């Protein structure tokens, strides 16, 4: 496994627009600018660019691809923009989408190929703004250059689009244990952010630490030890880690005040036009996907409705694109070139 000390450096770093301004984000570029394929990669909590750098480096070579690595707003640290200068309240779902859109624009501008095919690759919390972006941009006739040709989601999958509600295959209901695990860790992270940012930094750290220990003791922590080395290699100090939990705070707050349902947090509706590859690790205490969406994609592949498909890496956890880079890379390259 590649560590932070051996990460392949980007060949170029270009700015992209966020709510913080024209230079709000930094896009790490890998590969030939005239490659026929381009891909934007974005991870989730609690990761900056580094988690995707090794994967992007190899994807650029083996997939004949220009790859741009971004991260969620507020998740990166640069000399000219330390994390303490990011928005104190964190970034809303709409803010995150603006960042994805800005990164795609910058990636398109960096590409010199006349007809490059765009793939979006998103992991964990990156899937949320990735899904919102693709749902919105596919409805914009005036922005064809920003529309992806294919999408790839790692380990998180949102519900089917509302237009599919009458054509969803049967799928098993999540167990009570799985539901409890999913709710508990989200609430712990949301409250940790709330306490640190608005009450006391010490209280935030105490609540986060006690909550983490309690989840381990009660076997409510969603991941197994297969992912421990990845966390260790990309670990940040506690205040930084807690600040990066702002998506959980906005999630809990939006569900509480009823605004969550206004967002198009779902799969995109036309899987034939824009095929979707979903890869997930099977070695976890819970899964971060909707079972009906997995069943939907499995039917797409089984019946040949689209090029969409699902792959489960049974022995891997949440960070399989780090711990089992070869298998993940093979699947993504094959999907992009199909």
What are these regions (language model features)?
Residues 31-80:
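Conserved HGGG/HGGXW glycine-rich cap/lid loop of the alpha/beta-hydrolase fold
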Residues 46, 51, 75-115, 119, ...:
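Flexible "cap/lid" subdomain of the alpha/beta-hydrolase fold that forms the substrate-access gate
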């Amino acid at each position: 496994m590649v560590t932070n000390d051996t990460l392949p450096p980007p060949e170029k770093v270009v700015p992209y627009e966020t709510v913080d301004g024209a230079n709000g984000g930094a896009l790490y570029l890998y590969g030939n600018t005239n490659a026929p394929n381009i891909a934007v990669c974005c991870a989730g909590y609690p990761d900056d660019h580094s988690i995707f750098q090794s994967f992007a480096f190899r994807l650029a070579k083996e997939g004949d691809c220009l790859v741009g690595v971004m991260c969620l707003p507020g998740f990166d640290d640069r000399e000219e923009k330390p994390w303490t200068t990011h928005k104190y309240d964190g970034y809303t779902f709409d803010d995150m989408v603006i960042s994805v859109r800005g990164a795609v624009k910058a990636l398109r501008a960096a590409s010199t190929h006349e007809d490059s095919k765009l793939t979006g690759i998103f992991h964990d919390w990156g899937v949320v703004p990735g899904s919102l972006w693709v749902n919105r941009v596919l409805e914009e006739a005036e922005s064809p250059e920003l529309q992806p040709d294919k999408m790839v989601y790692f380990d998180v999958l949102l519900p089917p689009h509302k237009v599919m509600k009458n054509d969803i295959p049967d799928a098993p209901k999540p167990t009570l244990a799985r539901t409890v695990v999913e709710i508990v860790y989200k609430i712990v992270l949301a409250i940790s952010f709330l306490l640190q940012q608005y009450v006391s930094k010490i209280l935030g750290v105490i609540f986060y630490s006690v909550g983490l220990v309690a989840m381990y003791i009660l076997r409510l922590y969603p991941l197994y030890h297969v992912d421990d080395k990845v966390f260790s290699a990309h670990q940040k100090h506690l205040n930084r880690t807690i600040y990066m939990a702002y998506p959980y705070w906005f999630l809990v707050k939006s569900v509480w005040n009823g605004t969550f349902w206004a967002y198009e947090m779902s799969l995109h509706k036309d899987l034939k036009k824009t095929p979707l590859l979903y890869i997930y690790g099977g070695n976890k205490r819970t899964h971060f996907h909707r079972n009906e969406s997995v069943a939907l994609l499995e039917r797409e592949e089984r019946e040949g409705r689209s090029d969409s498909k699902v792959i489960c890496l049974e022995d891997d956890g949440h960070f399989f694109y780090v711990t089992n880079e070869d298998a993940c890379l093979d699947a993504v390259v094959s999907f992009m070139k199909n």
